[in-house]
Amino acid sequence: MMNAVDKYSTDNIADNEMIIAVEDVVKKDYDSAVVRIKKALARLKSIGHVEKYAEYLNILGLVYELENDESKAFECYLESLATAEIIRSRDLKAMVYSNIGSSYSKMGRDKEAQRCFKEARDEYDSSSEKSEECHKSWVMFDYINHAINDRYVALS
């Protein structure tokens, strides 16, 4: 059984893995980013930090999009969305719906994209979780989403 210090330490190590993973994304080293995020996810799972696990899983989906692996991205998004539903995190659901909508949009599936963007807006408007921690997650998601959009524009 882990004590509070061990859980805190494990949580911090997971956060550090994520910070380095985002740096890997900046360097376009997506394989390394995936490895680091998976390490962070394993650590979070071991201490039962469900919400952060779902947030990082959503980020892993974004990195898979950068690697053009839509099926793995959707797997991550759907698991993250299901977890967000279970823990009743409207802010996290908004983030996931937004990412799914972006994926659908890039595939030209505009009707599905619009539905997801509407769900994202509705969830965010109803969220009471607009805390600093949520803001940090939105900043990470936003940064990686910009990287994805830049990549798709360059490929067009």
What role is predicted for each listed range?
Residues 8-12, 51, 91, 132:
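Residue signature of alpha-solenoid helical repeat architecture, marking inter-repeat boundaries
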Residues 15, 55, 95, 135-136:
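Residue register of alpha-helical TPR repeats
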Residues 2-3, 39-43, 81-85, 89, ...:
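Amphipathic alpha-helical segments of tetratricopeptide repeats
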Residues 24, 44, 64, 84, ...:
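Eukaryotic all-alpha helical interaction scaffolds
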